[in-house]
């Protein structure tokens, strides 16, 4: 009886934990059989004769053995069904995670002070199966952090190329961190529109690590931001970074930390009235800084800022920057003034305003019709064209020096040829030049003639001194012949100039009365 009651208790417990409907039906049938068997056993013990007891005992043993075998079969079927469910769940997880390979996510990383989430790239699925704290099966993913802040998070460049000689435990860099799939969060893309003064950011330095800092000023036109780094030397603390080298910290956790720190600071500062006044000043400065940042978002210049200082070395912008002006904001203490300079307008002299408006309407309402800059550019274009024409005219013009050098001083001509060329010089060519130019050229040619005569005298002395050397005599004869040809050419040129000067003097005498 006690064994039957124990078996009935086991069946009732199994019935409470059973989830499959077919298994529950089998357990209910077994429970009914046990209850009937217990009822029959009690009736038999009360009114059965003593000679039938051994036979009934054998029947009870057979029934108990059959009950045990059925329980074992049910337990084996339940365990096999559980194993199949776990394998199916694990296969679905692997299929899901394999499809996520190559996607960006936010993965946890264990630091000495706790766990922090960083953006990462899923690069593979690990073969090992893990069990969560709730008893749920899960797979592990291998991720590479895109914004590493510590050496152990920095991806190994040799591992990415497949050439790393160290395994994962011995390499100083990361071969990919293993994280559970359930701990993966959504990727947080950088939002550069939230860059503002005192915004915490991560900045990329040459060591390939992202260091923490705070924004000092932002230039949304050139997409450059100045950041004050935390924990750096004084000389290298403030640097300029491009937007792609920054990651704004805009998570809810950062905002909660900032709010909690502000609340604690405000509670401490409220202890004295002087500190309260300083807080009001800080709030006012923050409000003005926020207005400047809002103006940066809406500023869309049509031209490069400071283009009017192209020829002034930018002294105006430098002075304004010294006085606290931020590029891209408007003028004034609140940054609500104009951004681009006022263009100067020059109206036609002696015309009424109505006539000027009619001229502007005739030009299709052009606002820059009377602009000084446009007139200056038009004058510059006109002057440039005039300079080009003057250059072409001067390049085609032939003066007396060029004409004489090209026509008379041509190389390889004999003295007779020089005289013939000099005779063929046209009078109208020389008549194009002034008397002063002819006088200067005459003096120059006279000096050249005297120089050639001195050279010829030196060569003649050398000939007389070295009469016994045949080779030297030959070279000196060639030099003498060359000097004679050049002297003949210069003399012919001098005669042409003298003739022109004499002609002009004769004409002047003819015109005098």
Curated annotation (Swiss-Prot):
Residues 252-261, 272-282 have a biased composition (Acidic residues). Residues 262-271 have a biased composition (Low complexity). The keyword Secreted does not apply. Disulfide bonds: none annotated. Residues 252-282, 478-513 are annotated as: Disordered. Keywords: DNA-binding, Metal-binding, Nucleus, Repressor, Transcription, Transcription regulation, Zinc, Zinc-finger. It is found in: Nucleus. It holds the Pfam family G-patch. Residues 478-495 have a biased composition (Polar residues). Its main location: nucleus. Residues 312-358 form the G-patch domain. Coiled coil: none annotated. GO terms for molecular function: DNA-binding transcription repressor activity, RNA polymerase II-specific; RNA polymerase II cis-regulatory region sequence-specific DNA binding; zinc ion binding. Residues 496-513 have a biased composition (Basic and acidic residues). InterPro entries: G_patch_dom, Znf_CCCH. Transmembrane segments: none annotated. Transcription repressor. This is Zinc finger CCCH-type with G patch domain-containing protein.
């Amino acid at each position: 009886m006690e064994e039957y009651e124990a078996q009935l208790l086991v069946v009732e417990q199994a019935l409470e934990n059973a989830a499959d409907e077919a298994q529950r039906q089998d357990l209910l049938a077994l429970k009914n059989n046990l209850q009937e068997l217990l009822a029959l056993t009690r009736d038999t013990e009360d009114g059965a004769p003593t000679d039938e007891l051994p036979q009934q005992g054998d029947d009870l043993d057979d029934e108990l053995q059959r009950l045990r075998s059925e329980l074992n079969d049910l337990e084996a079927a339940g365990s096999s069904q559980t194993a199949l469910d776990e394998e199916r769940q694990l296969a679905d997880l692997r299929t899901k995670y394999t499809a996520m390979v190559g996607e960006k996510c936010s993965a946890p990383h264990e630091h000495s002070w706790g766990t922090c989430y960083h953006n990462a790239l899923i690069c593979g699925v690990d073969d090992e199966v893990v069990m969560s704290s709730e008893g749920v099966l899960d797979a592990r993913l291998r991720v590479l952090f895109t914004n590493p802040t510590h050496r152990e998070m920095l991806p190994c460049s040799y591992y990415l190329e497949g050439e790393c000689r160290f395994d994962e435990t011995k390499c100083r860099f990361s071969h990919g961190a293993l994280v559970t799939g359930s701990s993966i969060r959504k990727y947080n893309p950088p939002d550069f529109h939230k860059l503002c003064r005192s915004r915490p950011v991560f900045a990329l330095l040459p060591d390939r690590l992202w260091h923490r800092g705070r924004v000092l000023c932002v230039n949304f036109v050139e997409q450059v931001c100045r950041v004050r780094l935390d924990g750096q030397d004084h000389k290298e603390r403030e640097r300029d970074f491009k937007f792609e080298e920054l990651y704004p910290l805009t998570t809810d956790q950062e905002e909660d930390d900032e709010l909690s720190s502000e609340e604690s600071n405000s509670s401490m500062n409220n202890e004295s009235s002087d500190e309260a006044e300083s807080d009001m000043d800080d709030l006012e400065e923050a409000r003005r800084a926020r207005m400047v940042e809002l103006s940066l978002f809406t500023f869309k210049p049509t031209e490069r800022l400071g283009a009017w200082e192209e020829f002034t070395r930018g002294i105006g912008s430098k002075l304004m920057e010294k006085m606290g002006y931020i590029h891209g904001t408007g003028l004034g203490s609140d940054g609500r003034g104009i951004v681009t300079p006022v263009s100067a307008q020059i109206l036609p002299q002696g015309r009424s305003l109505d006539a000027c408006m009619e001229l502007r309407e005739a030009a299709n309402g052009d606002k820059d019709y009377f602009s000084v800059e446009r007139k200056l550019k038009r004058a510059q274009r006109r002057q440039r064209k005039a300079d080009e024409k003057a250059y072409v005219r001067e390049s085609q013009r032939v003066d007396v020096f060029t004409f004489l050098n090209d026509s008379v001083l041509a190389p390889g001509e004999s003295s007779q040829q020089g005289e013939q060329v000099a005779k063929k010089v046209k009078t109208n060519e020389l008549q194009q030049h002034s008397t002063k130019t002819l006088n200067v050229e005459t003096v120059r040619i006279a000096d050249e003639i005297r120089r050639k005569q001195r050279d010829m005298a030196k060569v003649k002395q050398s000939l007389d001194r070295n009469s016994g050397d045949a080779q030297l005599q030959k070279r000196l004869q060639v030099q003498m012949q060359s000097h004679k040809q050049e002297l003949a050419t210069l003399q012919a040129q001098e005669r042409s100039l003298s003739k022109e000067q004499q002609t002009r003097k004769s004409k002047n005498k003819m015109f005098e009365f």
